[in-house]
Amino acid sequence: MSEGDSLLVTVPDKNCVLGDKLTAFAPHTTGIPFGIDKELEIIKQMFDCWTLLQEMDDYQTVEAVYDHVAQVEAGYRGLSIQPKDVLLDTIQSCLCIMGRNGIRPDDYRHYLTGINAIQGHIFRGRINGENAGMLACEIMYLAACLLTKADSFERVSDPEAYKDFAFTLKGMKRINYIRSVDPMAYAYLVKALQLLQPQGYFTDSIL
């Protein structure tokens, strides 16, 4: 038995951890950068974000933690950027992974190295070039919610309601395969673009 007064320790919950980890999946800003042999870590951040997103139950906490951590990390790196710049980095990263070498190929080779390396680090299922893009759709939607200051993260209950949505954007053909491969992932992609376009993002091209 220990003696003395008990200490109250505050432990970050899943929502806090998600907000924190999302800032690390932004290789051109506050995240783990390319070129330092950390490609596996970059993909692990993406996978962790997707896994935590399945359990997220407090979007406002994710939003608050993300905003704080993004600003702290930017300051630590001496970057004159705002959280919105970090979120755009994450969104572009998601699109790159969806594009499978068709969008930002120089970046994709780094992601693919991480995707190939992560197989021995997950306990169930497999991640490959195709289904990594499916995970990226949901992460992109979360980033879009944060970027556009959405009031909530709306989970998709009926993916069939989104299957007929189409976007005439340059580069869209490179990710249209998602519609037939994974209707749920495509629904989140649609929801992300529906948030982003009215605010002037990706109105002409996703490249």
Please give the residue ranges for each predicted region.
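Catalytic cores of NTP-dependent nucleotidyl/adenyl transfer enzymes across multiple folds
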Residues: M1-R124, G133-L147, P159-L207
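An amphipathic alpha-helical interaction surface
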Residues: K149-D151
